[in-house]
């Protein structure tokens, strides 16, 4: 006896129904709120069913994660499937397509019965992959914030010290700090440099480099001084201007530190997965893009052939043929994960 539990998950509640082959309804669609009492009641009900029971739900957003964790921790078979598979599934032979929580739960239950032997059980490794994906999305979010903060600082420097962001091209340190950012924190206005003599600035710059742990060069000091001599600043050298620039630097440094910490933690977590050494051995992939690729692909073993992975990324050309018409060149479907496509693009851009 097969029991298919279909769960349509929302933020604060889920709609649950239980079906058996032959469209037998064991439990009509009902709402279960996400609290300990109602979840435990649902667990007891599912465990009390006769026969084999499998729970199926869509892995949409983050809402499904508490439910799948609670049920799987209770020893119940739970499978979280791609919502596109549920959307494209239709066994009703009807033109009606109701979009309600009850209808969705029933559709998920019917899908579970139809794909009974193919349902993959959610496990501890899936929790690691979900955590990795969340960290990667946070990494992308803070990278966007870092870019915005960097552009904001450069815009302020255009008013106080034009071109100062181009004085150095050194890469970011492990803590996220960069030489040009630290430089403009101390020399936040062009008059902070040209207001001194060349000798005085060179000595001050040398002490600054030693204190910050940066390389010092007399030629570089002279170059900065000469470039600063002819610049025009729109904002005056006063406390308000100093506050604006230094505040922008502080925010940028804080965001940069978060980005670098996430970068390290993502790599550390990804290294616990079995595919990590294989992915890092690929061309164009390092300790940043490798973990991102692993995070966005998820469990690669669920793809039975390479075409399935291509379709998941949405880079497969769809067919366009009808009668005598057959298109030779088709655009990619772009039906899959945009985050995965972005990662793949960055990798290929580096290789080419």
Residues covered by each model-derived region:
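A detector of single, family-specific signature residues
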Residues: 1-352
């Amino acid at each position: 006896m097969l029991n298919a539990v279909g769960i349509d998950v929302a933020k604060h509640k889920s709609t649950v129904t239980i079906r058996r082959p032959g469209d037998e309804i064991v439990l009509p669609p009902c709402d279960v709120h996400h609290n300990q009492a109602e979840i435990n009641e649902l667990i007891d009900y599912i465990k009390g069913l006769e026969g084999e029971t499998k729970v199926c739900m869509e892995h949409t957003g983050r809402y499904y994660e508490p439910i799948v964790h609670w049920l799987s921790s209770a020893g119940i078979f739970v499978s979280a499937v791609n919502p596109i598979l549920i959307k494209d599934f239709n066994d009703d032979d009807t033109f009606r397509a109701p979009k309600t929580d009850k209808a969705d739960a029933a559709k998920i239950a019917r899908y579970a019965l139809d794909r009974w032997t193919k349902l993959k059980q959610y496990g501890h490794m899936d929790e690691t992959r979900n955590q990795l994906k969340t960290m990667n999305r946070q990494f992308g979010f803070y990278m966007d914030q870092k870019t915005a903060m960097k552009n904001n600082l450069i815009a302020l420097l255009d008013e106080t010290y034009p071109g100062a962001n181009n004085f150095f091209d050194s890469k970011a340190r492990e803590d996220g700090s960069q030489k040009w950012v630290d430089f403009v924190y101390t020399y936040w206005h062009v008059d902070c440099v040209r207001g001194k003599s060349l000798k005085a600035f060179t000595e001050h710059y040398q002490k600054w480099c030693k204190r910050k742990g940066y390389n010092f060069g007399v030629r570089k000091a002279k170059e900065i001084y000469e470039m600063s001599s002819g610049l025009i600043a729109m904002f005056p050298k006063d406390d308000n201007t100093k506050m604006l620039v230094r505040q922008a630097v502080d925010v940028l440094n804080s965001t940069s530190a978060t980005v670098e910490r996430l970068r390290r933690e993502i790599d550390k977590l990804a290294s616990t997965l079995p595919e990590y050494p294989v992915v890092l051995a690929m061309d164009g992939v390092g300790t940043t893009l490798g973990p991102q690729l692993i995070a966005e692909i998820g469990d690669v073993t669920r793809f039975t052939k390479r075409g399935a992975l291509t379709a998941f990324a949405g880079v497969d050309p769809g067919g366009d043929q009808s009668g005598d018409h057959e298109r030779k060149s088709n655009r990619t479907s772009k039906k899959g994960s945009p985050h995965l496509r972005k990662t793949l693009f960055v990798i290929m851009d580096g290789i080419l």
